[in-house]
Amino acid sequence: MFTYYLSNVIYDCFEFTGIQSGNLTHSVESGNRIFIYGAVVLLVAMGSMFFVISLVNKLAIIRKLLRDKEMALDLIARQNEELESREKSITDGLIYAQRIQEARLPSEEFLRNYFPSSFIFFKPKDIVSGDFYWIEEYGDRLFVVAADCTGHGVSGALMSMIGMELIEKAILEDHIIIPSHILAAMNVALEKTFSRKKNIGTIIRDGMDIGICLIDKGRQKIFYSGAFIPLYLLRSNSLNQINGDKILIGMNPDRILYTDHEIDIQEDDMLYMFSDGYVDQFGGKDNKKFMYRRLRYLLLTIHRFDVL
């Protein structure tokens, strides 16, 4: 009796819940599917959440990189402004130094007062130059000097100022008029000027190439002496190269004897003195130096034409 009653109760319960013995297995399978679907949905949701979190982190990193880039660009802009300001200050200083140097150089018109068919070609590479020229009357004679100081730009320009001072002292104050003696006096004076630094352990190895011409128009003669810088004499479609001594001014503490050359002037003679600035220019399709051979050919080609 009790067993029968219990079986009826269980049957009623299954019937109430909609589960009968025939579809019990189906209900379990449906539950499994629901669980799987739920798990999939949960995984998708978690994946989406992780994706969103990763995306947010990446966006944060990108924003930080952009801020860092903006800060770097701002720093670069400020540094560029500072560099431009410094460059302008340096350039302004060099331009002012150029005016000082040019004020010390004689004008081309001054030379043309003596030699109408003459010219000066002076084109500094770095605003100021280590090359210089010097022209001065001495009685009825004329000194013409061309020089190339060691160093470039500012250092060469400072050396050129020293060089002009030494020339003026030798000729105008000490009245040394023989070109070779002027070079010897300059060599000693320049070496003494820089030897003062030797006492503190610093040896300055600076000097200059230089050529000096003393032109005596009354006697129709030129007296030339040089240290490395040559004198070119063009006459009757030929070029005569008169070389200076290979002894740099200021680099030899001993009393050096330089060589004098005496030249008789003839009508239509053309004389050139120059530094190595022109021949050291690079150019052409192979970007090679101009060199002395091309310069000699150029001078032979143009010397028949009027200078002006």
Where are these regions (language model features)?
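Charged alpha-helical signal-transmission linkers that cap and connect PAS-family sensory domains
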Residues: 63, 70, 153-154, 158, ...
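Hydrophobic transmembrane alpha-helices
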Residues: 1-31
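Structural motif marking the loop-to-transmembrane transition
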Residues: 27-35, 39, 101
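Signal-transmission/dimerization alpha-helices at domain junctions
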Residues: 41-48, 165-173, 281, 298-301
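… and, occasionally, acidic/histidine-rich disordered N-termini of signaling adaptors
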Residues: 74-271
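C-terminal catalytic subdomain
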Residues: 264-273, 278-308
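Conserved acidic
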Residues: 55, 148, 276
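Juxtamembrane or sensor-core-proximal signal-transducing alpha helices
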Residues: 36-69
